[in-house]
Amino acid sequence: GMVPGFVAGHYTLDQCVIQLEPLLKGTDITWLPRSVTALDANAKRVTLDDGSALDFDWLSVNTGPVQDRKKTGALLPGAREHGLFVRPIESFGALWPQVLAMAHTQPLRLAVIGGGAAGIELCMAVRHRLPKASVTLINGSSELAANYPERVRQRVSQALKARGIVVLLERASHIQAGEVTLESGATLACDMPLIATSAQAPAWLQSSGLALDEQGFIAVDAFQRSPSHDRIFAAGDVSTRMDQPLPRSGVYAVRAGPALLTNLTAVLAGVPPVPHLPPKNTLNLLSCGDHYAIATWGDYSAQGRWVWWLKDWIDRGFIKRYSRP
């Protein structure tokens, strides 16, 4: 996404998000700016955060993953009290300027907790924006960028080292004011921990009655349909393809959109749905903060300023495509 570019100072927050209300203007779609608090799949009812309920005949879920503060706080004590969560972007975007203001008064010691693509990109974005700050990546596992091919892991490691970012290949055990304690017992002085741990399934799915995977995400088949409730479909990071597990990536979420539309249209017309076949390889672009990026396509990889400009062109184009004046 474009959040690392926002952190690095390349974009404003408004340039990183798609405003749904203007996009839906002039359509027959009813826009409800609410959050879901409960889903009863058997009763075909969704409950919203204002207490209202919506009954449905068919349901499509694409709420995306969340950073469950309560769950994260249980796994990493002190995270809720002392950490800055990168999700949701609206909350993070409102608080990030306060970190920048702090950096004007003192050299900051920052730690990014979470060694996935989000944490890696965030580290390098912070380094670009705050060159005087010390930046540490607490990876959380024994291998950096574990989901990438070996050559890409080497590129990522070299990029972090070249930017003076310290990488710790162990987990954080708890956070308190001014420091992060690691599982080894060592402590790291830290003015602001940035929480970029793996996203989680929304808590309300647990009591929904839907078939879920081991991590609590909605299980779906090749039609993006729930195997337990055939009138409920799901796509994007909130779901898991049980026939073909996929990385939780925006690319796969976007590719599932047209297939979801096709199948919803089909079942409403009484026509059998068709399987969605995700591509074997997708273009993965990892930004390095300073107008530089690493590209991955299957086993092929490349890096350079041209990769960043390609990523910038793709990201801006996607936002523009779904934005209205």
Feature locations, PLM:
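FAD-site-proximal beta/loop scaffold in flavoenzymes
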Residues: 79-106, 187-255, 262-263
